[in-house]
Amino acid sequence: MAIERTFSIIKPNAVAKNVIGSIFARFESAGFKIIGTKMLHLTVEQARGFYAEHEGKPFFDGLVEFMTSGPIVVSVLESENAVQRHRDLLGATNPANALAGTLRADYADSFTENGTHGSDSVESANREIAYFFGEGEICPRTR
Protein backbone atom coordinates (compact mmCIF):
# COMPACT_ATOMS: atom_id res chain seq x y z
CA MET A 1 0.00 0.00 0.00
CA ALA A 2 1.28 3.46 -0.89
CA ILE A 3 2.24 6.13 1.60
CA GLU A 4 -0.27 9.00 1.55
CA ARG A 5 -0.44 12.45 3.05
CA THR A 6 -3.51 13.90 4.69
CA PHE A 7 -4.39 17.25 6.19
CA SER A 8 -5.60 17.81 9.73
CA ILE A 9 -6.93 20.78 11.69
CA ILE A 10 -7.22 20.96 15.45
CA LYS A 11 -10.07 23.46 15.68
CA PRO A 12 -10.40 26.42 18.09
CA ASN A 13 -12.47 24.57 20.70
CA ALA A 14 -9.90 21.76 21.00
CA VAL A 15 -6.99 24.23 21.07
CA ALA A 16 -8.79 26.09 23.89
CA LYS A 17 -9.06 22.81 25.84
CA ASN A 18 -5.25 22.50 25.70
CA VAL A 19 -5.34 19.02 24.15
CA ILE A 20 -2.97 19.61 21.22
CA GLY A 21 -0.30 17.35 22.71
CA SER A 22 -2.82 14.61 23.46
CA ILE A 23 -4.09 14.71 19.89
CA PHE A 24 -0.56 14.65 18.47
CA ALA A 25 0.27 11.68 20.72
CA ARG A 26 -2.75 9.83 19.35
CA PHE A 27 -1.69 10.60 15.77
CA GLU A 28 1.76 9.17 16.46
CA SER A 29 0.44 6.17 18.41
CA ALA A 30 -1.76 5.38 15.41
CA GLY A 31 1.33 5.30 13.17
CA PHE A 32 1.16 8.74 11.57
CA LYS A 33 4.26 10.84 11.03
CA ILE A 34 3.68 14.56 11.55
CA ILE A 35 5.65 16.10 8.68
CA GLY A 36 4.36 19.66 8.89
CA THR A 37 2.52 21.66 11.53
CA LYS A 38 1.85 25.22 12.59
CA MET A 39 -0.51 27.24 14.74
CA LEU A 40 -2.33 30.20 13.25
CA HIS A 41 -5.38 32.37 13.73
CA LEU A 42 -7.45 32.32 10.54
CA THR A 43 -8.71 35.56 9.07
CA VAL A 44 -12.27 35.67 7.78
CA GLU A 45 -10.88 35.65 4.24
CA GLN A 46 -8.74 32.56 4.90
CA ALA A 47 -11.65 30.69 6.48
CA ARG A 48 -14.04 31.63 3.66
CA GLY A 49 -11.45 30.52 1.10
CA PHE A 50 -10.73 27.23 2.81
CA TYR A 51 -14.43 26.38 3.17
CA ALA A 52 -15.48 27.89 -0.19
CA GLU A 53 -17.19 24.64 -1.24
CA HIS A 54 -19.73 25.22 1.56
CA GLU A 55 -20.54 28.84 0.68
CA GLY A 56 -24.29 29.34 0.41
CA LYS A 57 -25.09 26.48 2.79
CA PRO A 58 -27.01 27.35 5.97
CA PHE A 59 -24.08 26.57 8.27
CA PHE A 60 -21.40 28.48 6.31
CA ASP A 61 -21.41 31.78 8.21
CA GLY A 62 -21.41 30.03 11.59
CA LEU A 63 -18.54 27.80 10.47
CA VAL A 64 -16.47 30.81 9.38
CA GLU A 65 -17.24 32.59 12.66
CA PHE A 66 -16.22 29.52 14.69
CA MET A 67 -13.03 28.87 12.71
CA THR A 68 -11.90 32.48 13.23
CA SER A 69 -12.78 32.51 16.95
CA GLY A 70 -9.34 31.37 18.11
CA PRO A 71 -6.12 29.71 17.02
CA ILE A 72 -6.06 26.47 15.09
CA VAL A 73 -3.29 23.93 14.48
CA VAL A 74 -2.89 22.70 10.91
CA SER A 75 -0.82 19.60 10.21
CA VAL A 76 0.30 17.33 7.41
CA LEU A 77 0.27 13.67 8.40
CA GLU A 78 1.84 10.78 6.53
CA SER A 79 1.20 7.04 6.65
CA GLU A 80 -0.14 4.19 4.57
CA ASN A 81 -3.79 4.87 3.66
CA ALA A 82 -3.50 8.14 5.61
CA VAL A 83 -6.77 9.76 4.52
CA GLN A 84 -9.04 6.91 5.59
CA ARG A 85 -7.05 6.01 8.69
CA HIS A 86 -7.12 9.64 9.85
CA ARG A 87 -10.88 9.88 9.26
CA ASP A 88 -11.36 6.68 11.25
CA LEU A 89 -9.34 8.16 14.13
CA LEU A 90 -11.39 11.39 14.03
CA GLY A 91 -14.76 9.64 14.11
CA ALA A 92 -18.09 10.78 12.72
CA THR A 93 -18.46 14.48 11.89
CA ASN A 94 -21.41 14.65 14.27
CA PRO A 95 -19.95 13.79 17.68
CA ALA A 96 -23.30 12.27 18.70
CA ASN A 97 -22.51 9.51 16.18
CA ALA A 98 -18.77 9.23 16.91
CA LEU A 99 -17.56 5.93 18.31
CA ALA A 100 -16.02 5.90 21.78
CA GLY A 101 -12.27 6.42 21.63
CA THR A 102 -12.32 8.62 18.54
CA LEU A 103 -11.05 12.19 18.73
CA ARG A 104 -14.49 13.69 18.14
CA ALA A 105 -16.07 11.52 20.80
CA ASP A 106 -13.41 12.75 23.21
CA TYR A 107 -12.97 16.42 22.24
CA ALA A 108 -15.99 17.68 20.26
CA ASP A 109 -18.57 20.04 21.73
CA SER A 110 -21.16 19.99 18.92
CA PHE A 111 -21.62 19.27 15.22
CA THR A 112 -19.94 22.58 14.29
CA GLU A 113 -17.44 22.64 17.15
CA ASN A 114 -16.34 19.06 16.52
CA GLY A 115 -12.71 19.61 17.49
CA THR A 116 -10.99 18.36 14.36
CA HIS A 117 -11.00 18.33 10.57
CA GLY A 118 -9.56 15.75 8.22
CA SER A 119 -9.38 15.56 4.45
CA ASP A 120 -12.04 13.38 2.82
CA SER A 121 -9.94 12.27 -0.17
CA VAL A 122 -6.38 12.32 -1.46
CA GLU A 123 -7.39 15.11 -3.86
CA SER A 124 -8.84 17.18 -1.01
CA ALA A 125 -5.73 16.51 1.07
CA ASN A 126 -3.47 17.81 -1.70
CA ARG A 127 -5.59 20.96 -2.11
CA GLU A 128 -5.88 21.59 1.65
CA ILE A 129 -2.17 21.03 2.26
CA ALA A 130 -1.30 23.48 -0.53
CA TYR A 131 -3.69 26.04 0.97
CA PHE A 132 -1.68 26.23 4.20
CA PHE A 133 1.81 24.89 3.45
CA GLY A 134 4.57 25.69 1.01
CA GLU A 135 6.80 22.79 -0.04
CA GLY A 136 9.61 24.07 2.18
CA GLU A 137 7.34 23.77 5.23
CA ILE A 138 6.84 20.02 4.85
CA CYS A 139 9.65 17.82 6.13
CA PRO A 140 9.43 14.18 5.05
CA ARG A 141 10.88 11.91 7.70
CA THR A 142 13.08 9.16 6.38
CA ARG A 143 14.35 7.86 9.72
Curated annotation (Swiss-Prot):
One Pfam family from the record: NDK
Keyword terms of this UniProt record: ATP-binding, Cytoplasm, Kinase, Magnesium, Metal-binding, Nucleotide metabolism, Nucleotide-binding, Phosphoprotein, Transferase
GO MF terms, alphabetically ordered: ATP binding; metal ion binding; nucleoside diphosphate kinase activity
Cellular component annotations (GO), alphabetically ordered: cytoplasm
Cofactor names: Mg(2+)
EC code(s) of this entry: 2.7.4.6
Record bears the keyword Transferase: yes
Reaction catalysed by this enzyme: a 2'-deoxyribonucleoside 5'-diphosphate + ATP = a 2'-deoxyribonucleoside 5'-triphosphate + ADP; a ribonucleoside 5'-diphosphate + ATP = a ribonucleoside 5'-triphosphate + ADP
Function: Major role in the synthesis of nucleoside triphosphates other than ATP. The ATP gamma phosphate is transferred to the NDP beta phosphate via a ping-pong mechanism, using a phosphorylated active-site intermediate.
Subunit structure comment from the entry: Homotetramer.
Family per similarity comment: Belongs to the NDK family.
Entry protein name: Nucleoside diphosphate kinase
Gene that encodes it: ndk
